[in-house]
Amino acid sequence: MLGYADTLSEQEMKNLARFIYLKLGLKEDVSYRPAEGIYVTEDLKIKPDTVIRGLNVPWGLAFLPDGDMLVNEREGRMLRYRNGVLIAEIKGVPKVHAEGQGGLLDIRLHPDYRSNGWIYFSYSGFPEKGGEGWNTSVMRAKLKDNTLVEKQLLFEGTPPLTTNFHFGCKLTFDTKGHLFFGVGERGTMKKVADLSNDWGKVHRLNDDGSIPHDNPYVNTPGARKSIWSYGHRNPQGLVISPFDGTLWESEHGPKGGDELNLIEPGKNYGWPFITFGINYDGKIISPDTAMVGMEQPVTYWVPSFAPCGMTFVTGKRYKSWEGDILMGSLRFHNLVRVKLKDGKVIHREVLLNNIGRMRNVEESPDGFIYVSLEEPGMIIRLVPVQE
C-alpha cells in the first residue's frame, strides 16, 4: 500500500522512484523476470511456470469453460487468452477511472455460467447520472463474439467521491448464488460506520442485483440495503470457503495492521476506531485495538505486507495445503500461506520470496494455483514438483 496515494498519482510515484534510483547512480534493470527455478516450501516443492507475459497491472482473472482465460488490466482492457496467447481484446468494456488505485478490477463467472453465460466484473466508474467523482461499480454482461452484450449495472457505490484510492473490490459467490463484494472506505475514515453510504462495507446482492430479503439492514431506515458488514478499510481479498461456506476477507491496514477477517452479517469490523496500525506519517489513528461491539481479526500483520488476492486451496494439486488460504503480497513480493483449524490460524508460511509484486491469487477449475504479478505484468502457474 502506497503511503502517498492520496497526494501523488501512481505514475508520478513511479517517476519519482526512478529519478531517485538514477540519481544514486544505479542502473535500471528492465530485464527482471521472476525466477522459474524450484521453490522449496515446508510441505512441498513448487515450480513457477510463466503462462502470460507483457501485461499491464493484471488485476482480475477468470477461467472460461473452454479453457480460455479472461484477464482484466487495470487500465481498462479485458483480454482473452488461449494457451497463453492473446486471441482477443474484449469489446464493450465500460469506461473506467484508471487513476491511482482505480481502474478495471476483478472478474468472476457466475457459478452456473455454462447455462446462463453471465460474467461479473468490478471497476472504478463514473456516476451513471453524471456529476463529480467516481465510484466502485459492479456490472454483469454476457460474452458474444468477444464483445460484452446485455450489460447490466448492478451496483454503483454512493455517494461518488474524488479520491483515487481504496476502491476494493473483489467478487465472490456463495453456493446459493449470492454475490459478495468489498468496497473500500475511500478515505472517509469514521464515515464507514454510517450505514447510509456504501464505503468501507462488504455488500451482498442476488445474482441479478436485487437485494436479498435476509440481508441484515433491509429493515433499517436510511441504511443501504446491500450492506452485509461494515468497518472495513480496504478489502483486497474476498473468498467463500469451499469447505464450509464461510466468508473470508483480507484487508489493507495503514502502516501495520493488515487483517484476515471471518465475515459475518451485521458485524462491525472496527475501522478506524480500532486498528493495529498507525498512519503513514507516524500519527496514532486510534489508541485502541479492541472495543465492545467490534470484531477482532482472525489474525493481523505488523508490519503490513499489503495483501491482495486470496484463495482457498482445495487440495486437488497440493494435497498438503488442502484447506489453507493463499494470499498475495504487494509489498514483500511473495505469497503467504495461512493454515486454519476450527476458524483459527494455527500456522503461517511465506512462500516464493521475491517472485514479484503479487496482485491476485486464483485456483483454476483443474486445481492449479495462478498468480498475477506486476512490474513486469505476467501470470504464472504454480506447478507441484513430484519427488
Each language-model region and where it sits:
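Conserved blade-ending motifs and adjacent loop-strand segments that build the rim/top face
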Residues: 232, 344-365
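Beta-propeller blade signature
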Residues: 135-146, 195-208, 262-264
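Repeat-solenoid scaffold signature
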Residues: 223-262
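Blade/loop signatures of beta-propeller domains
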Residues: 28-47, 147-148, 208-220, 273-293, ...
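Beta-propeller fold detector
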Residues: 49-52, 87-94, 149-156, 209-217, ...
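Acidic, Gly/Ser/Thr-rich repeat motifs that build Ca2+-stabilized beta-propeller blades
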Residues: 12-13, 20-189, 237-240, 245-253, ...
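Electron-transfer interface patches adjacent to heme c in soluble/periplasmic c-type cytochromes
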Residues: 2-14
